Amino acid sequence: MAEQQKGLTYADAGVDIDAGNALVERIKPAAKRTARPGTVSGLGGFGALFDLKAAGYHDPVLVAATDGVGTKLRIAIDTGEVDTIGIDLVAMCVNDLVCQGAEPLFFLDYFATGKLEVAQAARIIEGIAEGCAASGCALIGGETAEMPGMYHKGDFDLAGFAVGAMERGADLPQGVAEGDVLLGLGSNGVHSNGYSFVRKVVELSGLGWDAPAPFGGDSLGRALLAPTRLYVKQALAAVRAGGVHALAHITGGGLTENLPRVLPEGLGARIDLSAWELPPVFRWLAETASMAEPELLKTFNCGIGMIVVVAADRADEIAALLAAEGETVTRIGEVIAGEGVSYDGRLL
């Protein structure tokens, strides 16, 4: 009898179930290190459980956020420097949650690629776990999608999903009034927005990712991959102290577009651009691209990653609290009657 012809397997089609299982086992210790009160289940189930009562909540309202890291991924892929891109992913989600007054509780990630490389994926997800641990947020689940034919070799995509909570009635923004003070918390670079523009500027400059960064520090690639700062613990400490009326995460749209999102109708903001020094990376981007200052202000964080809107009579106290938490705090302006954001002084 002729030998029976061997049939196709899922691996023949480009999907390696064994690699997926190996990845789960490899990242379990990292996920376990993010456990916090309320964590019920580990990785591997059909769903993940979280106990709000065990987390200390009595009448909670849930808040959800989802985000990615945009084309910053392209730099991580091209340089092979993927260890911190997961921190960016977490930061983009949990920094948004805290702007609602919520404490981040748990996080799920989505990792998609054409061919699963376990070592690469583990480095990325271990970065996600690091970001979760730093923000008090449990990594309780995720999805790894191996999709042959959908991505070029070596490429991958990331998305994150965070859920937080606050007690009913504690949501932000709340009570924003004319005369409130704007406290700016420093960024450490571009964070995770505007990277399509950044990559275009790098192309115009003729520099490679391994060239020395023109604005100082490490190689250009590593300097631009500095992970987005996590503002969760320090921002929540300020909120719990009282007097904080709003928080604005300065992401895509820059100062010009993000601050008005937390201001009620009829109120705007005046910002003094001379209150802080524009970080060198933004000056280099602006000068290389002949970028006008208004365009810079509505594209990048310009050195201010989070704005705390606080009652004027509590501003000094909250600024001192944030400084004690390790923040670089600058009084950058105030809430005024009107609409939108107006600027005094110059950055460039």
From Swiss-Prot:
Keywords assigned: ATP-binding, Cytoplasm, Ligase, Nucleotide-binding, Purine biosynthesis
One Pfam assignment: AIRS
GO molecular function, one term: phosphoribosylamine-glycine ligase activity
The enzyme's E.C. designation: 6.3.3.1
Principal cellular location given in the protein's record: cytoplasm
Entry-linked SUPFAM superfamilies: PurM C-terminal domain-like (SSF56042), PurM N-terminal domain-like (SSF55326)
Record's subcellular location: Cytoplasm
Pathways involved: Purine metabolism; IMP biosynthesis via de novo pathway; 5-amino-1-(5-phospho-D-ribosyl)imidazole from N(2)-formyl-N(1)-(5-phospho-D-ribosyl)glycinamide: step 2/2
GO biological process, one term: 'de novo' IMP biosynthetic process
Nucleotidyltransferase keyword on record: no
GO CC terms of this entry: cytosol
Protein name: Phosphoribosylformylglycinamidine cyclo-ligase
Organism, as annotated: Cereibacter sphaeroides (strain ATCC 17029 / ATH 2.4.9) (Rhodobacter sphaeroides)
Gene: purM
